[in-house]
Amino acid sequence: MAELDIQISVEDIGWPGEETLLSFCERVLGAAAVYLRDSEKQPFPTMAPEVSLVFTDDASIQDINAEWRGKDKATNVLSFPAFPVQPGKMPGPMLGDIIIARETLEREAAELEKSFDDHLTHLLVHGFLHLLGYDHMNSAEAEIMEGLETRILAQLGLSDPYEGQDLKMEP
């Protein structure tokens, strides 16, 4: 696995325990980093870059979404890169923060008929790609980012999250 320094904060009691989440996230994000390094030639710092993960609830993520994006509603995942980085370029020693809302994750997983863990995996990969400079503000960016998500998830044994879905990640 590629080394990442993963820091976790659990702010909602409905989430699994911190040790369980840390182990899960190390597996998912480690696999994503290895895929990006080996298949996409994504450079990483020699020292393990830090990723901060916050597992919260809809109310908290709604407040953050309103403050930072001007969207006063809950969302599934928010990512805040620590430093500006272009896709495929060397990131800084701190990648940034990924914040995930439990209730939205649970609701979407049920709607998509996916397990909690499978949808959490997708949201972690999606957020991680944002920290590395990928985005989906237009169709060209979305095609690249969603293609990477699909290939990384396939490495983890998961199907294409966008296949047959009209649900795309909102900008």
UniProtKB/Swiss-Prot annotation:
Q: Spell out the InterPro entries in the cross-references.
A: MetalPrtase_cat_dom_sf_prd, YbeY, YbeY_CS
Answer yes or no on keyword Nuclease: yes
E.C. number: 3.1.-.-
Of the GO CC terms on this record, one is: cytoplasm
One GO BP annotation is:
rRNA processing
Disulfide-bonded cysteine pairs: these are none
Q: Which residues bind Zn(2+)?
A: 126, 130, 136
What are the subcellular locations of this protein? Cytoplasm
Q: Which UniProt keywords apply?
A: Cytoplasm, Endonuclease, Hydrolase, Metal-binding, Nuclease, Ribosome biogenesis, rRNA processing, Zinc
UniProt keyword Hydrolase present:
yes
Coiled coil, from the record: none
User: How, per the record, is the cofactor bound?
Assistant: Binds 1 zinc ion.
Question: Which co-factors does it depend on?
Answer: Zn(2+)
Q: What does this protein do?
A: Single strand-specific metallo-endoribonuclease involved in late-stage 70S ribosome quality control and in maturation of the 3' terminus of the 16S rRNA.
Q: Per its UniProt record, what HAMAP family does this chain match? A: Endoribonucl_YbeY
Q: Which family does it belong to?
A: Belongs to the endoribonuclease YbeY family.
> What name does UniProt use for this protein?
Endoribonuclease YbeY
Which gene name does the record give? ybeY
